[in-house]
């Protein structure tokens, strides 16, 4: 206690908040030895303090010489202006870039910027030292000074008001002048008692309590009806305030008025500076600030975009723009306040003077010396107390501030170098009368001075309980007690109770099987997120750890159940979007390709898995037949699951701060599905580059499963995410459209019966840049030849597939048809079916010529019900088929060898299709679009890809590779088509970040 009393003497200290040069963005304080401030004034970025010994101290920015020290260098410590010592300074006022001073002898001095003649020296030359304004004589006893952006005002004891400087908006009340370089009297025929200059408007109060405003009329800052705004260059009375006005304060775009009973505000309030709440950002009608109408306000001050109110009890309320911490609500609270908020830091002090500037605030306060009954403060705390609510008996110097610290700023404090931490400490008292002082008054608010004679002899503090005077000092210093709070706080609450800086996690109680909804601290970036995940078993509480184990067991059980039924989960490619391209992608063609398809080995990889793929072909075929056999079982289960899978899959906004707990729960379920498929895909041989991507995906999925925290991306990652989110807004609803869910589910099951017919040699999911266009002939040749070869290689499985083809619906696309469709995307179902018809007819003709299979004819005619243009395009295709018939036989062997090699085998295709059956809650049209992206030709050139665009509508709906099948075997195709897909990833607005693909449709 004794130490704290020595830090803050009984005479009080000047507390600084915001951007003050004295302590940038860090609350600090200083005091004068054997002296006290009697006047504080804040400019845009500089400050003036007048002490009881009639000394002037200045500090802050000095670009125009506004500090009057003979130079233009900024001053970080309060510095006494020795040139004015003989004059005995009495008042000071700071404008945006100039300073006014008055002395006991009646002299008025000015220094700083003078571009509009605001120094009153008869010219427009800047001054870096104080020069006397000769207009004023000792007979003019100055009562008050005020300064605005480029304006100045002086009020005499006899009620005369003089103004000079810029009058471009009529802010000095001279109707017919643009600006004046010497003082001119402004009168309304009544003596004036108070003056305040804002940035571009001004206001004064007459002796009988009437309020007059003039200057810039925008935003309602004058408080006048529209019909009176035409005369805004002349003072006009504000009739909307019936009570007697005592004080007025003008800010950058708002005005605050103190009457005998209440406080009014009007003007611009987008930062909350009106104190009228979040639903009123501008008003020309004076409004009562209801939140503090029960408090007896004795002084008001306005900064550019914030406001401060002082009560007779010495309490301080602030509201408005919270940047730089200028509201004095704590180092962690830089948020805007839309209602008057009690500065709990000053509960142990009695506030005596306040001043608001452009980006800072100064408060002079003394320790409370007496005792006070607690009931007197009861109405003060709720609901307007600044960051926490606690009783006056619970005001320990450390806990009160620390409990309101946000996690983000607590981390910022920990990362701050030790040298900056020392700035928080109190500077030693300045020696003698030359002690430095920092006090702020806003340019648009009149300086608030406290004469020595008026220093409260019997202030409310006499009846107050003695409180620790080191209360504020300890708040300014970071204490390790915050980080080392109870284990429960650090684990469950993220070391903060600031609801704006917390998210929540649901965990399952091991004993009662209930959901515990506990807040957790959000992480700042992906690296931090991963580190926390790695240490989760060591740091989380027991319930969280048990939940993690139960989730893993549940995951294995679900996987086994799906495996027994022939239903497989497909891993969403979206999970890998948290990684940068450099971390995962290796191909030169890759730019922003989804990582799940990255492949660094190029076309050479086509020989890697050939042998192993051929060895397990029979096993894959068996699995396919089993999947078709359990169609009815899946059909019943799918009806209940179809509405949930796509919602469970995370979208690209899964890491946004505004995501709610529902999205978190859905993300956890998506992670479980991803993990299920990841474990199975390890059975298939893949290039090292792909396996690396898979490991990243598994790790990422596991981390999301262990603790589904929201992630704060770094600034670069956030920008990328935001850009992607903007592009996806238009189509996000399409992914969750459930209008055709039942129809799609039925079609999906029927489609599975077509799979045994094809070996699915080509399954890369290719996308085409919108700019690409190409001839149709070259594409048609390649398509026909590869279709013929694919059909021949699958002849041995035709017997079992005939029945399936007969039952297929008209809108189902087989895997063989999908390759051509994969190169295009159509926004209409009719357009899709036109393309489907083309492909089917080609298949029909080719099989009639080669095999004479009737079922192929049936298949080819399936989708023709959707459009008439199909037949015309089909005729052109038939001609191309006839021309290439002869060359087809020559290419058989090469194509067979090529087709047997790649990655798209029955086993992989069935897994993808089965997983899509689970996710079948998208409309049929959406699935068809995605199916059309399945690339059936691994070597289709970009020129060939252009054909597919010409035969369809524009490509605004091309989806990124994440929207296509994430086949584990896609090796060659990934590199061949990466460029086009990457372009789509970053440009097309319809690229949902969903990792959902429709293999079947």
Curated annotation (Swiss-Prot):
Male transgenic mice carrying multiple copies of the Rpgr transgene are infertile showing normal mating but no progeny; these mice also exhibit reduced sperm numbers as well as morphological and functional defects in the sperm flagellum. This is X-linked retinitis pigmentosa GTPase regulator. GO terms for biological process: cellular response to light stimulus; eye photoreceptor cell development; intraciliary transport; positive regulation of autophagy; protein localization to non-motile cilium; retina morphogenesis in camera-type eye; visual perception. Its main location: Golgi. One of its GO terms (cellular component) is centrosome. Prenylated. It is found in: Golgi apparatus; Cytoplasm, Cytoskeleton, Microtubule organizing center, Centrosome; Cell projection, Cilium. InterPro entries: RCC1/BLIP-II, Reg_chr_condens, Signaling_Regulatory_Domain. GO terms for molecular function: guanyl-nucleotide exchange factor activity. Residues 631-641, 659-671, 794-818, 847-857, 902-911 have a biased composition (Basic and acidic residues). Disruption phenotype: Knockout mice show photoreceptor degeneration owing to autophagy impairment in the retina. Residues 404-428, 631-738, 794-869, 902-925, 962-1001 are annotated as: Disordered. Residues 976-1001 have a biased composition (Polar residues). The modification Cysteine methyl ester is found at residue 998. It comes from Mus musculus (Mouse). A lipid is attached at residue 998 (S-geranylgeranyl cysteine). Keywords: Cell projection, Cilium, Cilium biogenesis/degradation, Cytoplasm, Cytoskeleton, Flagellum, Golgi apparatus, Guanine-nucleotide releasing factor, Lipoprotein, Methylation, Phosphoprotein, Prenylation, Repeat, Sensory transduction, Vision. The keyword Repeat applies. The RCC1 repeat region mediates interactions with RPGRIP1 and RAB37. Residues 999-1001 form a propeptide. Residues 679-691, 717-731 have a biased composition (Acidic residues). Pfam families: WD40_RLD. Acts as a guanine-nucleotide releasing factor (GEF) for RAB8A and RAB37 by promoting the conversion of inactive RAB-GDP to the active form RAB-GTP. GEF activity towards RAB8A may facilitate ciliary trafficking by modulating ciliary intracellular localization of RAB8A. GEF activity towards RAB37 maintains autophagic homeostasis and retinal function. Involved in photoreceptor integrity. May control cilia formation by regulating actin stress filaments and cell contractility. May be involved in microtubule organization and regulation of transport in primary cilia. RCC1 repeats lie at residues 54-105, 106-158, 159-208, 209-261, 262-313, 314-367. The gene is Rpgr. The modification Phosphoserine is found at residue 518. Interacts with SPATA7. Interacts with PDE6D. Interacts with RPGRIP1 and RPGRIP1L; PDE6D, RPGRIP1 and RPGRIP1L may compete for the same binding sites. Interacts with NPM1. Interacts with PDE6D. Isoform 5 interacts (via N-terminus) with SMC1A and SMC3. Isoform 5 interacts with CEP290. Interacts with WHRN. Interacts with RAB37 and RAB8A (in GDP-bound forms); functions as GEF for RAB37 and RAB8A.
């Amino acid at each position: 206690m004794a130490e704290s009393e020595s830090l803050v003497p009984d005479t009080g200290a000047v507390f600084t908040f915001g951007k003050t040069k004295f302590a940038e963005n860090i609350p600090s304080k200083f005091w004068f030895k054997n002296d006290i401030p009697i006047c504080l004034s804040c400019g845009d970025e500089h400050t003036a303090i007048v002490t009881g010994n009639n000394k002037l101290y200045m500090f802050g920015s000095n670009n125009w010489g506004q500090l009057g020290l003979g130079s233009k260098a900024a001053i970080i410590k309060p510095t006494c202006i020795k040139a004015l010592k003989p004059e005995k300074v009495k008042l000071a006022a700071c404008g945006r870039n100039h300073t006014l001073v008055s002395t006991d002898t009646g002299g008025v001095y000015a220094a700083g910027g003078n571009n509009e003649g605001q120094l009153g020296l008869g010219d427009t030359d800047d001054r870096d030292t104080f020069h006397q304004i000769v207009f004023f004589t000792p007979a003019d006893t100055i009562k008050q000074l005020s300064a605005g952006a480029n304006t100045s005002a002086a009020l005499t004891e006899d009620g005369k008001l003089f103004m000079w400087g810029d009058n471009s908006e009529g802010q000095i009340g001279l109707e017919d002048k643009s600006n004046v370089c010497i003082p001119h009297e402004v009168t309304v025929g009544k003596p004036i008692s108070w003056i305040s200059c804002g940035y571009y408007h001004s206001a004064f109060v007459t002796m009988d309590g009437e309020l007059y405003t003039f200057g810039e009329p925008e935003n309602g800052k004058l408080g006048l009806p529209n019909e009176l705004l035409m005369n805004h260059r002349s003072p006009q009375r504000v009739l909307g305030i019936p009570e007697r006005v005592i004080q007025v304060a003008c800010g950058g775009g708002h005005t605050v008025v103190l009457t005998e009973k209440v406080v009014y505000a009007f003007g611009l309030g987008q930062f909350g500076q009106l104190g009228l709440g979040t639903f009123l950002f501008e008003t020309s009608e004076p409004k009562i600030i209801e939140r503090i109408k029960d408090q007896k306000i004795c002084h008001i001050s306005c900064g550019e975009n914030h406001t401060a109110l002082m009560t007779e009890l010495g309490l301080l309320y602030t509201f408005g723009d919270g940047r730089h911490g200028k509201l004095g609500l704590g180092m962690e609270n830089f948020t805007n306040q839309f209602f008057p908020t009690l500065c709990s830091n000053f509960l142990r002090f009695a506030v005596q003077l306040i001043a608001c500037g452009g980006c800072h605030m100064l408060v002079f306060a003394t320790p409370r010396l007496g005792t006070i009954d607690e009931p007197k403060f009861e109405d003060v705390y709720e609901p307007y107390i600044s960051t926490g609510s606690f009783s006056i008996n619970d005001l320990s110097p450390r806990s009160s501030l620390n409990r309101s610290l946000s996690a983000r700023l607590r981390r910022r404090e920990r990362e701050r170098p030790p040298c900056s931490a020392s700035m928080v400490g109190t500077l030693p008292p300045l020696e003698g009368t030359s002690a430095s002082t920092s006090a702020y008054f806003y340019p648009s608010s009149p300086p608030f001075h406290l004469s020595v004679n008026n220093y409260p002899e019997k202030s409310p503090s006499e009846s107050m309980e003695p409180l620790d005077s080191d209360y504020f000092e300890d708040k300014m210093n970071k204490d390790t007690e915050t980080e080392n709070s109870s284990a429960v706080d650090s684990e469950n609450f993220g070391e903060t109770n600031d609801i704006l800086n917390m998210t929540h996690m649901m965990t399952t109680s091991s004993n009662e099987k209930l959901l515990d909804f506990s807040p957790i601290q959000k992480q700042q970036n992906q690296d931090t997120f991963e580190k926390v995940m790695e240490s989760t078993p060591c740091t989380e509480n027991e319930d969280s750890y048990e939940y993690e184990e139960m989730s893993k067991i549940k995951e294995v059980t679900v996987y086994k159940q799906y495996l027994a039924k022939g239903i497989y989960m497909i891993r969403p490619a979206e999970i890998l979007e948290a990684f940068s391209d450099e971390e995962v992608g290796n191909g030169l063609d890759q730019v922003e390709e989804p990582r799940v398809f990255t492949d660094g080995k190029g076309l050479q990889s086509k020989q890697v898995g050939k042998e192993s793929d051929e060895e397990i072909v029979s096993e894959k075929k068996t699995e396919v037949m089993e999947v078709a056999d359990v169609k009815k079982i899946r059909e019943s289960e799918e009806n209940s699951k179809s509405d949930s899978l796509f919602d469970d899959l995370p979208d690209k906004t899964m890491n946004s701060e505004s995501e709610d707990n529902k999205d978190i729960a859905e993300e956890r379920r998506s992670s479980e599905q991803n993990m299920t498929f990841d474990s199975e895909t390890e059975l298939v041989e893949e290039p090292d580059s792909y396996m690396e991507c898979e490991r990243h995906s598994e790790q990422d999925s596991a981390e999301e499963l262990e603790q589904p925290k929201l992630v704060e991306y770094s600034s670069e990652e956030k920008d990328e995410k935001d850009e992607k989110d903007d592009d996806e807004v238009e189509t996000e609803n399409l992914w969750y459209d459930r209008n055709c869910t039942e129809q799609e589910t039925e079609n999906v099951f029927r489609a599975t019966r077509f799979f045994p017919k094809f070996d699915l040699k080509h399954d890369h999911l290719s996308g085409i840049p919108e700019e690409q266009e190409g001839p149709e002939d070259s594409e048609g040749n390649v398509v026909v030849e590869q279709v013929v070869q694919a059909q021949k290689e699958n002849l041995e499985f035709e017997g079992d597939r005939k029945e399936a083809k007969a039952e297929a619906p008209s809108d189902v696309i087989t895997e063989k048809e999908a390759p051509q469709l994969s190169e295009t995307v159509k926004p209409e179902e009719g357009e899709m079916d036109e393309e489907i018809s083309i492909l089917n007819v080609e298949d029909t003709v080719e099989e009639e010529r080669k095999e004479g299979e009737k079922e192929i004819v049936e298949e080819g005619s399936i989708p023709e019900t959707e459009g008439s243009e199909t037949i015309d395009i089909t005729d052109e295709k038939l001609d191309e088929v006839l021309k290439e018939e002869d060359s087809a036989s020559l290419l058989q062997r090469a194509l067979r060898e090529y087709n047997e090699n790649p990655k798209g085998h029955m086993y992989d295709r069935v897994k993808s299709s089965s997983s899509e059956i689970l996710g079948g809650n998208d409309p049929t049209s959406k699935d068809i679009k995605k199916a059309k992206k399945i690339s059936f030709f691994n070597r289709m050139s970009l020129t060939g890809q252009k054909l597919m665009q010409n035969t369809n509508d524009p490509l605004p709906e091309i989806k990124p590779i994440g929207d296509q099948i994430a086949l584990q075997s896609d090796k060659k195709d990934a590199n061949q088509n990466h460029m086009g897909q990457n372009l789509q990833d970053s440009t097309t607005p319809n690229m949902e970040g969903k990792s959902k693909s429709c293999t079947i449709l």
